[in-house]
Amino acid sequence: MKIFLKKYYHLIIMAAVTIAFAYIPLNKRGFNVVDMEQEPLLEPGEYIISPYDNIFRRIARRHDVDWRLLCALAYCESRFNPDAYSPRGAVGMMQVMPHIARHWDVMESELLDPAINIDVACRLYKSMQKMLRFPKEVSERDKMAFTIASYNCGASRIIDARNLAAYYDEPKYEWDVVSDYILLLSSEEFYNHEAVCGGQFKEPHITIAYTNKVLSVYEKYVSMAEE
């Protein structure tokens, strides 16, 4: 029993968090649709990154996230297109999956509202950050990289790669190290490894490229705009 709990601990925790969110009343989650009132878009010359700068700033303050990071995610997900749909069903500027949005009682049609879409994406980002359970000594860049990757592919893949790195006595909280182990999860030798719970990761290179792209765009936005 102890071995089972040790191996599947993170999956049990993630399932519990998902179920808990589904049953918490909307007003107890801090999500208030009244707060998502329409804001006029900024005109050229009034914004630094996008016409949605004010919305990004407001929502980022609410959730204690760098607004420039949210902008970088939006750029990489949709080029700031609030009407974007992906072939896999992701919706809106931040490409939120409808089944994820339902955890916060947000319907698919509501995800076309930029403010609601950004807010749900921000909540998802923060929930991924909590699932990854970073020690205090982990650098902000590494925290950001792991969380961005989780936003793209889910936290379980990242946890598998970290566990694999730890098995081979590599630092499991350094992105530049663990990213190599993420790539290995496409290989049968490694996705069947005792340290791995989630099975094969078929397109790990996409997550690596996505994460590095978001980090690059974020660094550009940091040089352009103040926090």
Q: Model-predicted segments: where are they?
A:
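Non-catalytic cell-wall polysaccharide-engagement segments
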Residues: 2-34, 46-47, 63, 102, ...
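Extracytoplasmic
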Residues: 51, 65-70, 75, 88-91, ...
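Cell-wall polysaccharide-cleaving catalytic domain and substrate-binding groove, primarily
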Residues: 76-93, 97-100, 154, 214
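A generic alpha-helix surface/boundary motif
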Residues: 53-54, 94-95, 99, 123
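Short extracytoplasmic
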Residues: 38-66
